[in-house]
Each structure stands twice: as C-alpha cells, then as structure tokens.
Amino acid sequence: MNILFLHHSTGECVWKGGVPEWFAAYNARHQTDYRITESIFPKKRPYGWKNYPYDYWNIWVKNAGPTPFLEEPTLEILTRQYDVIVFKHCFPVSEILPDTGVPDISSKDKRIENYKLQYAALRERLHSFTDTRFIVWTGAALTEGSTSPDSARRAADFFKWVRDVWDEPGDNIFTWDFFDLETEGSPYMKDGHAAGPYDSHPSPAFSRQVAPLFCQRIVDVIEGRGDVDRLPQAPSEEVSHHFGS
C-alpha cells in the first residue's frame, strides 16, 4: 500500500512530528506494509509556492493529462504510483476575502465562492480515479494575531462546509479535520498550538501531538473505517502510546 503526502511547511512540521516512525511501528506490530512518502507540492519553481484550491484545480483539473504541468505531477501520473494520496493547504488559505457575488473558478482570489467551484471540480476529478483513495486536510488556520475576525469566520465556515457537505460518504474521498484540531472549535489557531502569536506554523509540541492522529486517520481510511471515524480526537500529550494503536 503506497501512500503519498503532498505538503508545504505546515505539513512538514507534522511529518517531522513522528509520521514515518508511527508507520514503522504500526507495520511492525500489525504485519502490514503501509509505505508512506512525502513530497513538496507544488515546488517553488517553476510553478510557485502556492497550494490553495485554485492551484490544485489548475494543475489537476484544468491541466490534467499524462504529462506534468510546470514540472508538477498530474493525477494521471500520481495515481499510477500511489494507492492513497493526501493533500492539504498551508495557512494562507484561511486569508479569505468577502464574496463578490460573481464566482469564478479560474480566479486566484481567496473567496469562498471561488473555493467552492474549485472544490466541486476537484471532487469530480478525484471521483474519476476510483482505485485511489484521497484524504484532504481541512485548511490550516491562522492565529488571532495573523488575521481578522471576519476572515477567520469565513475560513471556519468554509472548512466546515468541506467536512460536512463537500465530503460525501461512500466515495473515495475523505477528510481529516486539521482546522478543528488547531482551533478547538474557535475560528483561530490556538496560540498554544502555534509557533508564535504571529506565526501560524504548528509548534513542534503540537506537531508531535497530532501526527499520530493523522497517521491513524490514514490507516482508518485504508482499512475501511474512513466514513465511520471522520472527526479527529483531541490532541494527546503523549505520542508513543498511539504507535501501533
């Protein structure tokens, strides 16, 4: 079972929180062969350091096909190599502007009206790869010192929609509610989970707390529990007791 985790810096923090070690321990205990690897997507050059809804739509839907787009792999390429593909957005995704009333799927503007069109097209595209399971993180949140109340509320509303509406049971798409873990039900990333009041990267301690939950979510999806255990547990202070659980 080959698993790919596509990420930028927030995902790297969680990866370094113990993801490879968790899977090594799980495989040893359960005699499974779940092989996970990670990759920056998209890269800084030539595409650019942008992994927002527009960018997944741009690479995987608009420019779909058997060849890379600006050196980035399309779904046609990735699904030949991986059984499970996990992808996410970094925290600037939560810098959401007000809607204009004129949604545009090809717009880079961070607005709910555009995000929903891009997500709808992505869902249709992901559904076409029936032999691959996809796990989408709800977006990384911003600290209160890094955003406005209105923007934070729009982010909370959008990712609730992703979890409760966009993610349909019974298909090959699943979510992991990272936004909820970071915010604990508020619209802001908790300062205690962040690298700093104005730095919305997860702290090393928080990354170690949530890494086992991320790993367990992947295993639940692989083993057929993806629609049963949809909501993450609260972060644990200890990582080791999750290994092999």
Question: Which residue ranges define each predicted feature?
Answer:
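Active-site-proximal beta-strand/loop segments in catalytic clefts of secreted hydrolases
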Residues: L6-S9, T37-K43, F87-P92, W137-A141, ...
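Active-site segments of SGNH/GDSL-like serine hydrolases
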Residues: F91, R123-D157
